[in-house]
Amino acid sequence: MEHHLLHLVGLGEVDGVPYGGAQAVNLKSIVWYQPAEFEKRGYAVPETWDEMIALADQIVAEGMTPFCFGMYSNGATGWLATDWMEDIMLRTGNGVDSYDAWVNHEIPFNDPIVKTAATYLSQIMHTDGYVVGGTDAIVSTFFGNAQDPMFERDSNGNPGCFMHRQASFIPGFWPEEAKAGLGTETTFFAFPQMDVVSDTVLGAGDMWAVLVNDEATQAVVDFMLSDQYWTGVAENWSGTSSTRITAHTGFDTSKYWSPVVAQQAEFLKAALQANVFRFDGSDNMPTEVGSGSFWVEMTELATQGPGYIDTALDNIEKSWP
């Protein structure tokens, strides 16, 4: 475990006793796009929120749609909006300090800082023309298919959308022909800077836990954390083109089969080593909130519009155990 940061090890602790930790991590603070489509139209990759909004307005004015956005996920509908909220919270208010306070309920869910974040999110969800299919399509579009319009072309040769904020695992849901273009046709840029300039990275991951402490279990854990296991994943021995990234900060990122995955792995590795990685906030909240009221109220917000922000945040605050 010497190459697994204390932050990740701590996620598997109860009362200071380690029962597990993170095996794989994914990068969430990214926006997928197609460089050729940007270059063809003279679009610059946005580095700030205001630049992204200006670009979105330009795309709408030119008769196209800037964002893919779909959050339907069966019984888990709503988590995609919570990811947006988390990235925004890291870059507004007091940055990582208010993010940590929010996750730990040291500030209420209806705090003005949280309302500001929800207002930014609503700007994306509810501005006319910003999302594929309009606002009504957000909650009915399966998150795994949400980016598909980016890979399609209309009669004028324009893609269905130009930007999609989603984690590094999403290529696993792409159509097969789109997967072949990972890193060439489709790549990513960092989630734009906002009110608080920050290099903090949002992520999540696959966790492991030991429930039976015997030699066989230990052998499995040792193997799944080993260089041998991750070399197989990174070099695509299975032929599945996995985008999984190890939580092992000593792993040689040049082994990843795709330059894009290697770049994401290096991005995560640097964030972990610099202690600027933050695990998905809703995953660290009480179940009643993180996978309960937060999901439900973000779904309602998408449906109801910006006038529902106060009600959504008040309802989540009331649900905190």
Language-model features, listed with the residues they occupy:
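Short glycine- and hydrophobic/aromatic-rich loop-to-beta-strand nucleating segment
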Residues: 29-33, 208-210
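Extracytoplasmic/periplasmic substrate-recognition and gating elements
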Residues: 41, 169, 176-243
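Extracytoplasmic "Venus flytrap"/periplasmic binding protein-like
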Residues: 1-6, 11-13, 36-47, 149, ...
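Short helices/loops that flank or line small-molecule/ion binding pockets
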Residues: 37-38, 54-62, 142-164, 300-304
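Short, solvent-exposed loop/beta-turn-alpha elements that line the ligand-binding surface or hinge
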Residues: 1-4, 71, 91-116, 177-181, ...
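Extracytoplasmic ligand-binding clamshell segments of periplasmic binding protein
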Residues: 71-73, 94-177
